[in-house]
């Protein structure tokens, strides 16, 4: 009896588990818990018979003086715990590293007429894994130096073959931070741990079953292979799981009402869907939306990673529509062209919300009247989940922007509130509408209306922060969004601000606007607590990530630099993590 193996866990496997749990705790969802439980169960039950065979055939052994004593099918309990803790740690690391990635954007629809390399890559992987399995079987049959290596490969390769066959596109298509990194980090770490354990004799490989080759002093090649293969199994299992979820939640035509907690049968059905059946137009819309969000709003892109899958898709598509509509108007060469774009957008909404018109009519209108890079955003707008009025009001906000060509439309604080409500409050309102559509609550319609109205107010607060940050940027394009009566009270004229948007008086006005923003924010944030639990934390992140810009601007001595982010990426990440932690406290 001894505690050497138990001490390995105390020193090297449990501390990472605690750290990863604390890091991911604010983001942990019921679906994540299901993933972890599912993968741990599969990993432990699949490994126990294999490891038991190794021990009973003396390929692998644990000296009596290094283990406490209790066993399961001849496997020391410390080893059984290792199966659990390795899977848990690698799974959590994968969840952390993959969280920022909007994975459905990496699905690829098949084209019957295209000579895609995907099928050849799939076949190459299958042939390699089948060949490895055959080679491993021969090594086991020989019962010589390659026996342990053969047993590792003949056990793992068929499972990896199944994972590859079902999810090869996802495995090949996702960023390396979702695939290579979650395999490499725990593998390297366990190589170091194993080096220490083998040197101390915590576990022993029978000399006649190994090649005697070391990756480095203290790490035998078989052990290096074992940790690489097992971490690959875990991560590929996660990728197959997420591939299935992406299909379930991305294509409403294929899965009109996907369950929030899918069964294994749901996952298998999703993985068996041919890529030729994927909705290419919807995929293109999501891919375009992700690119726009990355370029235009880093704060919201960070916040979007915290939203559940189906809601995240709808929010991305909504943002994409709003962004494209805004760009069409802002980038117009003349005021007349901008008015034409607004008119066309009004016509598009008429078609979309008209009961008498088919979707084909609106699609034909978009194809005929909008540039190619704007079409997917319009056609993929989840209009069937949204009321028309907020979208109409958004266009009225663009019309207020055009009024700057003649005179400022923002003469009083009332005008400022109206403008902010139209261009930002409406967007926040639509976000809340989508949340209630996806996650029905027990509220009455009146109570839901109050929450939607509070969302509108919160959007106004965020727009105030945006205006406060961009005073100089806006002045350079000939616009001042501060009320004219505020300027008069400070002894300034509109033209003076256009020429010189800096100085003590302008800083005073910036602080005044921020005070208003935080006052509105304080009045509206209580409504967030009544949102469905699935969206409550993510909405907090979206709000706090932006309000952190306001807090930064209010810091004494802070200098605004036009065109530069006021909050660093890491500070936004910390704000998001703290916000989510508070939401579960």
Swiss-Prot record:
Annotated GO MF terms: 15-cis-phytoene synthase activity; geranylgeranyl diphosphate synthase activity; intramolecular lyase activity; lycopene beta cyclase activity; squalene synthase [NAD(P)H] activity
Coiled-coil stretches noted in the UniProt entry, renumbered to this chain: none
Record's keyword annotation contains Transferase: yes
Name of protein: Bifunctional lycopene cyclase/phytoene synthase
Function recorded in the entry: Bifunctional enzyme that catalyzes the reactions from geranylgeranyl diphosphate to phytoene (phytoene synthase) and lycopene to beta-carotene via the intermediate gamma-carotene (lycopene cyclase).
Family that this chain belongs to: In the N-terminal section; belongs to the lycopene beta-cyclase family. In the C-terminal section; belongs to the phytoene/squalene synthase family.
Keyword Transmembrane: yes
Catalytic activity field: all-trans-lycopene = gamma-carotene; gamma-carotene = all-trans-beta-carotene; 2 (2E,6E,10E)-geranylgeranyl diphosphate = 15-cis-phytoene + 2 diphosphate
Domain of life: Eukaryota
GO cellular component entries: membrane
Keywords: Carotenoid biosynthesis, Isomerase, Membrane, Multifunctional enzyme, Transferase, Transmembrane, Transmembrane helix
Signal peptide range in chain numbering: none
Ranges that cross the membrane: 3-23, 35-55, 75-97, 123-141, 151-171, 173-193, 221-241
Region (Lycopene beta-cyclase) location: 1-243
Topology within the bilayer: Multi-pass membrane protein
């Amino acid at each position: 009896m001894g505690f050497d193996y138990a001490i390995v866990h105390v020193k090297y496997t449990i501390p990472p588990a605690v750290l990863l749990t604390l890091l991911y705790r604010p983001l942990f969802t019921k679906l994540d818990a299901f993933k972890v439980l599912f993968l741990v169960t599969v990993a432990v039950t699949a490994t126990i018979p294999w490891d038991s065979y190794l021990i009973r055939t003396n390929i692998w052994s644990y000296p009596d003086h290094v283990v406490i004593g209790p066993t399961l099918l001849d496997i020391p309990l410390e080893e059984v715990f290792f199966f659990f803790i390795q899977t848990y740690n690698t799974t959590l690391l994968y969840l952390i590293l993959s969280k920022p990635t909007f994975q459905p954007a990496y699905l690829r629809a098949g084209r019957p007429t295209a000579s895609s390399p995907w099928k050849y890559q799939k076949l190459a992987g299958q042939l390699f894994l089948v060949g490895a399995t055959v080679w491993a079987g021969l090594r086991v049959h020989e019962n010589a130096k390659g026996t342990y290596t053969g047993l590792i490969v003949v056990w793992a390769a068929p499972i990896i073959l199944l994972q590859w066959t079902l999810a090869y596109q996802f495995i090949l298509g996702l960023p390396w931070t979702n695939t290579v990194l979650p395999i490499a980090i725990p593998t390297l770490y366990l190589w170091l741990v194993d080096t220490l354990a083998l040197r101390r004799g915590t576990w022993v490989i029978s000399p006649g079953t190994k090649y005697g080759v070391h990756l480095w002093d203290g790490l035998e090649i078989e052990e290096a292979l074992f940790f690489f293969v097992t971490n690959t199994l875990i991560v590929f299992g996660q990728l197959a799981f997420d591939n299935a979820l992406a299909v379930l939640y991305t294509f409403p035509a294929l899965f009109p009402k996907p369950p929030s907690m899918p069964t294994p049968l749901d996952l298998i059905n999703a993985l068996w869907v041919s890529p030729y059946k994927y909705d290419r137009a919807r995929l293109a819309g999501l891919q375009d939306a992700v690119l726009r969000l990355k370029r235009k709003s880093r704060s919201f892109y960070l916040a979007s990673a915290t939203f559940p899958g189906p809601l995240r898709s709808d929010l991305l598509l909504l943002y994409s529509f709003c962004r494209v509509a805004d760009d069409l108007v802002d980038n117009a060469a003349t005021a007349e062209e901008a008015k034409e774009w607004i008119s066309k957008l009004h016509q598009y909404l008429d078609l979309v919300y008209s009961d008498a018109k088919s979707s084909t009519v609106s699609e034909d209108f978009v194809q005929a009247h909008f540039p190619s890079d704007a079409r997917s955003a319009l056609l993929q707008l989840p209009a069937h989940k949204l009321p028309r009025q907020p979208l109409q009001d958004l266009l009225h906000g663009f019309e207020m922007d055009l009024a700057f060509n003649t005179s400022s439309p923002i003469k009083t604080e009332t005008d400022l509130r109206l403008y902010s409500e139209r261009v930002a409050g409406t967007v926040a309102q639509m976000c809340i509408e989508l949340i209630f559509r996806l996650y029905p609550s027990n509220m009455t319609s009146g109570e839901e209306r109050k929450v939607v109205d509070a969302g509108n107010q919160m959007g106004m607060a965020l727009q105030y922060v945006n205006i406060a940050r961009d005073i100089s940027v806006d002045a350079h394009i000939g616009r001042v969004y501060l009320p004219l009566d505020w300027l008069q009270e400070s002894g300034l004229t509109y033209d003076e601000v256009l020429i010189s948007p800096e100085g003590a008086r302008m800083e005073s006005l910036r602080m005044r606007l921020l005070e208003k923003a935080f006052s509105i924010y304080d009045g509206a944030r209580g409504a967030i607590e009544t949102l469905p639990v699935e969206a409550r934390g993510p909405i907090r992140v979206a709000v706090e990530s932006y309000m952190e810009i306001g807090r930064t601007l209010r810091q004494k001595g802070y200098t605004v630099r036009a065109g530069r982010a006021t909050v660093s990426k890491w500070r936004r990440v910390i704000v998001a993590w703290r916000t989510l932690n508070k939401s579960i406290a």
